[in-house]
Amino acid sequence: MSCNGCRVLRKGCSENCILRPCIQWIETADAQGHATVFVAKFFGRAGLMSFISAVPDSQRPALFQSLLYEACGRTVNPVNGAIGMLWTGNWNICQAAVETVLRGGSLRPIPELLTHGGGFAGFPSPTSEEASEICTEMLNLQQNDSTDRNIYHHSRFSSSRSRSTMDSSSPTKRKRLSSEDQPSSELDLSLIPNFPIKQATPSSTRRRSVTPSMNSEDSGTTTTTTAFCDKGDVYGNGGGETTKLLNLFV
């Protein structure tokens, strides 16, 4: 026989049904069906089954009860739900909403919960001493947290700025920046690298022999002497000997 939850959801039920133990704490069969339909509409049928399957068997009744109270509290107080109503001292309204659902009634949001008797947006009212202390402690924690974050971001920014300043103040950096800032007076479009030209001294200048023409007899080979060497042999020959070299520039 199908349980009341599976019956209203029109799904198959078996002996290992995960929904059956979740609604056994509700007294009547109609109330079980109303609670199942309300929770399934709020969280979705697949979401409800996923929540139930994610917890052990012993915790499933408490889970379904928590989902029912949260769905009713969120319907009545859309901003903070059941937790906000418990915090502001309006838990009796949440319990009344649950009883209304079990009887088959409908719920609607109550705007007065946001501004009347519970502070703005569900926060504790200043008239409650305990609630004021809790709210003050939370605000102090938030301010300290934000101050720490600001100090952290400021220190990161300061360290990065000082590091960039130190980098820009190095001699190599300044030299490179100054060379980049100076405009070039001419365009260097030459493919030959600009190396310093060594000026030949008069003492090292030697007279080159006349290149033979194409019609001359010595166009194939040219004769050079090694008489300019001060001392020592050249290519293993004695000083003053002549060597014939092939003239490739014909």
From Swiss-Prot:
Domain of life where this protein originates: Eukaryota
Listed Low complexity bias regions: 157-170
Pfam families per the UniProt record, alphabetical: LOB
Molecular function per GO: transcription cis-regulatory region binding
InterPro entries cross-referenced by the UniProt entry: LOB
Region (Disordered): 145-227
Family annotation (PROSITE patterns): LOB
Family indicated by similarity: Belongs to the LOB domain-containing protein family.
Protein name stated in the entry: LOB domain-containing protein 37
